[in-house]
């Protein structure tokens, strides 16, 4: 187990131009995998028994110039492809994308803006000030036990005003377009892929960008998403006799929701495994044109399941309807990953801020300039971009930490049970949960280091550990 962690973390050494930066990368990533609380980098110092002097060095690491965020992400993609048991649908890997919003009260944190949360959870306020992230993961494991390994989590909104700044890497595209771009960047490493998204991402800009990316490229990526119940598509235009004028691009309009009644005799019945249970459902598949001024041919699958009606949409006309239904049932896995990132590793508990960032005004009028628009000094802009870089580096480390924990859970399936680690009233079936695996690592980390003194990560951690003196009073029984 510990040698696998060593292999994963050692594969990132080429991403750092200084040995010290690589050492702090190893310590911080391992610390995120086993820390017992979410009180900043001090939790890493406590759980790994490091010297108190490490505190400032660990903070400085996030602002160091000795690493490239792009290279670290690319190395993480390659590491996942090399070491992780990835799930495949035919010849396609399965990517999952979604957005996640995190509340932030800091007035000088770049990228914070007013956001609307559409959720049925009464604990979530409708409006918050915080960060809007785009998360991307890949399915790993088998059909009976799988996890969504986080590949990247990037800021997708709130930073558009920095797009024209010098040395800025911020994209000026919308959230849905950036999600497609992030997925295709990952697909270049994992080869042909299917991207699962929720209905928010079924839009003309997203489909246009996907067509631009896959045209003329060897890597192919398809998209499976959900359509709104009010979705309207179009039949193909009927062939017409040659005459003057532009030929029609679309045919008769079709309200997809009405097909549940008008075509109910054409629905097929099937049984399949959905969300871990064998279920009965009815479905109907039809290929139609969709998108104003785009009119791209999509495959729509109408599904009746437990009294609910859903409409799925896919860009592939060769994908089996039942495969689309099963694939979309895996989309919720990224929601589970977001939950574990929040509750276990504390990935969204960062608080990077900059004194060069103008104070955020919660009551700013629309006619007044935004906070980032007020920054004109080049030095201040550079410091703000460094803060954004630190935030995304923290998210990258959290993805690596959580992905490694998930892979350990999959590798130890059948060998390690939750009951052997800690008591749980309802232990997870199959693989050990991420929280239980982190508890196991936290409990046995020093035993692992003692059993593997020659490993690279063991030596890097021991160099920074504090050698405390033994107090006689503590030996009294």
Where are these regions (language model features)?
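Structural motif
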Residues: 16-24, 123-128, 383-395
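Contiguous, well-ordered alpha-helical segments that form the cores/surfaces of helical PPI scaffolds
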Residues: 26-32, 137, 398, 402
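Single, function-defining residue in the core of a domain
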Residues: 1-13, 91, 108, 148-477
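Gly/serine-rich nucleotide phosphate-binding loop at the start of the catalytic core
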Residues: 1-63, 69
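Glycine/proline-rich, flexible active-site/cofactor-binding loop segments
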Residues: 40-53, 137-160, 289-294
């Amino acid at each position: 187990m510990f040698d696998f962690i060593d292999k994963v973390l050692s594969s990132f050494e080429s991403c750092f131009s200084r040995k010290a930066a690589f050492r702090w990368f190893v310590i911080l990533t391992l610390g995120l995998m086993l820390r017992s609380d979410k009180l900043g980098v001090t939790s890493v110092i406590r759980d790994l028994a490091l010297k108190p002097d490490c505190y400032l060095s660990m903070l400085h690491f996030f602002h160091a110039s000795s690493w490239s965020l792009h290279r670290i992400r690319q190395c993480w993609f390659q590491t996942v492809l090399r070491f992780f048991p990835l799930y495949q649908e035919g010849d396609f890997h399965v990517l999952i994308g979604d957005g996640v919003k995190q509340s932030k009260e800091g007035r000088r944190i770049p990228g914070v803006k007013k956001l609307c949360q559409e959720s049925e959870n009464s604990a979530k306020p409708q409006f918050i000030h915080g960060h809007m992230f785009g998360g991307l993961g890949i399915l790993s494991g088998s059909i009976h036990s799988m996890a969504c390994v986080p590949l990247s989590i990037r800021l997708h909104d709130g930073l558009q005003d920095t797009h024209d700044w010098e040395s800025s890497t911020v994209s000026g595209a919308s959230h849905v377009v950036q999600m497609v771009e992030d997925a295709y960047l990952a697909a270049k490493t994992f080869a042909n892929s299917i991207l699962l998204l929720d209905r928010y991402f079924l839009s003309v800009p997203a489909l246009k960008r996907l067509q631009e990316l896959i045209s003329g490229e060897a890597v192919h990526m398809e998209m499976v998403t959900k359509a709104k119940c009010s979705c309207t598509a179009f039949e193909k235009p009927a062939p017409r006799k040659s005459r003057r004028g532009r030929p029609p691009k679309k045919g008769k309009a079709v309200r997809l929701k009405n097909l549940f009644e008008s075509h109910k005799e054409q629905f097929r019945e099937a049984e399949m495994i959905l969300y871990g249970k064998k279920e009965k459902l009815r479905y109907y598949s039809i290929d139609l044109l969709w998108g104003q001024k785009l009119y791209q041919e999509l495959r729509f699958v109408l599904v009746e399941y437990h009294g609910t009606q859903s409409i799925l949409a896919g860009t592939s006309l060769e994908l089996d309807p039942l495969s689309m239904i099963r694939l979309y049932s895996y989309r919720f896995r990224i929601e589970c990953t977001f939950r574990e990132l929040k509750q276990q590793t504390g990935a969204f508990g960062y608080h990077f801020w900059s004194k060069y960032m103008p104070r955020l005004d919660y009551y700013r009028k629309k006619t007044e300039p935004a906070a980032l628009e007020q920054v004109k000094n080049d030095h201040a802009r550079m410091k703000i971009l460094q803060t954004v870089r630190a935030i995304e580096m923290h998210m990258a480390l959290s993805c690596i930490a959580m992905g490694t924990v998930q892979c350990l859970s999959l590798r130890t399936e059948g060998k390690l049970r939750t009951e052997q680690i800690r008591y749980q009233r309802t232990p997870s079936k199959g693989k050990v949960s991420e929280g239980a695996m982190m508890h196991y690592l936290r409990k046995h980390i020093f035993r692992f280091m003692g059993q593997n003194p020659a490993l690279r990560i063991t030596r890097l951690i021991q160099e920074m550990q504090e050698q405390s003196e033994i107090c006689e009073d503590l030996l009294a029984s």
